[in-house]
């Protein structure tokens, strides 16, 4: 399975900050925002990833991330010429995907406290689409998934006025190879975009959409506004200062996934020692702990 990391958009809700820098390059505590979703993909065992950006910001992302080889990854880059919707990512990445399954993650989403590997492995082996559900206070601001007592998906709607469930769909999606043709069949919405919710609805109509609910201990932060960004900073800082854990550390995720050996991790730590980030990486190599983080199991799966 290959990954797509969508880091396009104009960041209009964060202006004037985003006049000068991409939203996904803004710092969230001690690292760029893009590190957090990238680390999630890497922690799932995905090492071939296409980063989709705007044309004006492509060089900045390439300067930050390089080709990924320093982390044992293979990163490629592509441009979304205008805001064409999340689902357009599958058309942009068609050649990169090479007819295989895909994990798509939005570059402004932070997910923590969940082991997604079982779901990713299942998606590698089975046909269909897979989304996640997180209970939120105001689901009307998000895509919302509804399901019955048996766990079957009944509906999925984008920002409904009257939500049919409290479960929002975060920006992490798993699909089989059919997603490219599904996206190609869509018509632009009223705002001129190919909507990810319509992709999910197409899978639902075929009886091929499943959902996994993220339970207690799972954290989802969508950094769409400045207030959201500050909440993300507060959360990352609290975990760092309280538990000594750096969320969204790509180097650590790659090491734990087996993409880097310990000597390579130490080498990455050296030029970062003055910031404290390097000291954290160096400490990992001698902590005597298992490389595999122990996250709570996903609480419910439906299909």
UniProtKB/Swiss-Prot annotation:
Binds 1 Mg(2+) ion per subunit. It holds the Pfam family NTP_transferase. Signal peptide: none annotated. InterPro entries: G1P_thy_trans_s (IPR005907), NTP_transferase_dom (IPR005835), Nucleotide-diphossugar_trans (IPR029044). Keywords: Magnesium, Metal-binding, Nucleotidyltransferase, Transferase. One of its GO terms (biological process) is biosynthetic process. Its EC number is 2.7.7.24. One of its GO terms (molecular function) is glucose-1-phosphate thymidylyltransferase activity. Its cofactor is Mg(2+). SUPFAM superfamilies: Nucleotide-diphospho-sugar transferases (SSF53448). The keyword Ubl conjugation does not apply. Disulfide bonds: none annotated. Mg(2+) binds at residues 108, 222. It catalyses: dTTP + alpha-D-glucose 1-phosphate + H(+) = dTDP-alpha-D-glucose + diphosphate. Catalyzes the formation of dTDP-glucose, from dTTP and glucose 1-phosphate, as well as its pyrophosphorolysis. Probably involved in the biosynthesis of the acarviose moiety of the alpha-glucosidase inhibitor acarbose. NCBIfam families: rmlA. Belongs to the glucose-1-phosphate thymidylyltransferase family. PANTHER family: GLUCOSE-1-PHOSPHATE THYMIDYLYLTRANSFERASE, GLUCOSE-1-PHOSPHATE THYMIDYLYLTRANSFERASE 1. This is Glucose-1-phosphate thymidylyltransferase. It comes from Actinoplanes sp. (strain ATCC 31044 / CBS 674.73 / SE50/110). The gene is acbA.
